[in-house]
């Protein structure tokens, strides 16, 4: 049951970039399908001196008649030094027997990465696909942290839209996000809709699952601005 296989390939160019840190250094989200919470995303930020570690955990479980029909788990740790992305370690466990151990690090002006396709030598300016970092919307290519591959992306800015979180109305920037499909993907990469607060924090994203045509929404649950 591939309900969320591509749900979170979830959350700089070489120029310096500083993205927002949430209150209490944590952003948490509910993952919702058919009006039911089926999982969570938690991103924590550990900022010490010039080093920032961003840890993201995705935990999804779908039950049908009290029986687990689908599970997905992913974790990743990004390391940034002086506002530059230099390292990542990750793990993704899919609903079938697929699992990937992801690594990447800047070495000698090359980003050496490994994942589904083995070892890759990439431009050191590559960014990880973490929707929290709005800077990814300016890129042409990103590093997929779920499978350890490169995807080309295309982003379209839409009209700002008012959304509601925790009974608060927020005027958010809205974008469409598309990425190329890899030959080993089980299905097409879905089109994502992303909403960001004016301070650039990620508030919400959604997509339509290609297999069952159901909408999956991920929305911030600890927003208190």
Segment roles from a protein language model:
Residues 125, 130-135:
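Alpha-helical transmembrane spans
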Residues 13-15:
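N-terminal signal peptide c-region/cleavage motif recognized by signal peptidases
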Residues 107-127:
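Acidic/charged, solvent-exposed loop-and-adjacent secondary-structure segments enriched in E/D, K/R, S/T
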Residues 1-9:
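Sec-dependent signal peptide recognition
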């Amino acid at each position: 049951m591939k309900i969320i296989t591509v749900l979170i390939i979830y959350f700089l160019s070489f120029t310096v970039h500083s993205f927002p840190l949430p209150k209490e250094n944590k952003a948490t989200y509910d993952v919702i399908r058919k009006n039911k919470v089926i999982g969570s995303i938690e991103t924590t930020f550990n900022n010490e001196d010039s080093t920032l570690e961003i840890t993201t955990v995705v935990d999804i479980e779908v039950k049908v008649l009290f029986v687990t029909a689908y599970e997905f788990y992913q974790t990743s740790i990004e390391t940034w030094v002086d506002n530059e992305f230099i390292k990542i370690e990750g793990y993704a466990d899919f609903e079938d027997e697929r699992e990937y151990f992801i690594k990447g690090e800047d070495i000698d002006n090359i980003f050496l990465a490994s994942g589904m396709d083995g070892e890759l030598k990439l431009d050191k300016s590559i960014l990880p696909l973490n929707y929290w970092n709005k800077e990814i919307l300016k890129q042409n290519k990103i590093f997929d942290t779920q499978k350890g591959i490169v995807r080309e992306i295309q982003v379209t800015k839409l009209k700002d839209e008012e959304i509601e979180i925790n009974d608060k109305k927020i005027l958010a920037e809205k974008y469409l996000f598309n990425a190329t499909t890899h030959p080993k993907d089980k299905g097409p990469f879905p089109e994502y809709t992303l909403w960001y607060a004016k301070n650039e924090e990620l508030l919400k994203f959604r997509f339509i699952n290609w297999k069952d045509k159901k909408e999956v929404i991920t929305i911030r649950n600890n927003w208190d601005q």
